[in-house]
């Protein structure tokens, strides 16, 4: 179990603010915490990691070799080896030993259609710098939680737990439904 958290279209928040929000879900992943901030600070992705696969070098958020894709995942992709070898035909060299890194390469090859290829339990946040979009998704069974809210200043927050929304005046708060994905463009 990990904790994932993203802020999109942010307005005047400090790095300390994001770190404090991330600490609210630290119990979900005590082994590592990481944060990614886009250069304009419009996109912030935080990760609290519980190491299961890729214990030594599976830190998240995962940043692709080219630097254009940033990924934070709560979960496990059971068929990642099959996907790397038989679907992607070993065209990509993984930079981590994480089972979740395959998500980046599937997205590059198949766009949003890749999600139905995943066998596992997961919720994830994937940022594509080139397309200026963020994708959030949950597995078809909905084992791992993911919530999404829109604040009064039109910031979008996605998180593993509701407590990350405390203190924000929300216009909308929803559970990301199992087996679905949402794309946010900015």
Regions found by a protein language model. Give the residues of each.
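Cysteine-centered catalytic environments shared across enzyme families
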Residues: 1-186
């Amino acid at each position: 179990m990990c904790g994932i958290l993203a802020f999109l279209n942010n307005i005047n928040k400090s790095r300390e603010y994001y770190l404090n929000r991330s600490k609210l879900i630290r119990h979900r992943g005590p082994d590592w915490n990481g944060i990614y901030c886009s250069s304009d600070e419009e996109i912030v992705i935080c990760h609290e990691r519980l190491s299961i696969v890729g214990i030594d070098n599976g830190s998240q958020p995962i940043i692709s070799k080219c630097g254009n894709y940033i990924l934070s995942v709560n979960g496990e992709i059971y068929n990642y080896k099959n996907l790397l070898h038989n679907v992607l035909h070993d065209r990509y060299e993984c930079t981590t030993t994480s089972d979740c890194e395959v998500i980046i390469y599937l997205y590059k090859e198949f766009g949003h259609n890749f999600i139905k290829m995943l066998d596992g339990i997961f919720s994830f946040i994937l940022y594509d710098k080139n397309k200026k979009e963020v994708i959030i998704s949950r597995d078809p069974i909905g084992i791992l939680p993911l919530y999404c809210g829109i604040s009064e200043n039109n910031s979008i927050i996605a998180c593993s737990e509701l407590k990350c929304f405390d203190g924000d005046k929300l216009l909308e708060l929803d559970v990301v439904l199992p087996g679905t994905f949402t794309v946010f463009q900015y």
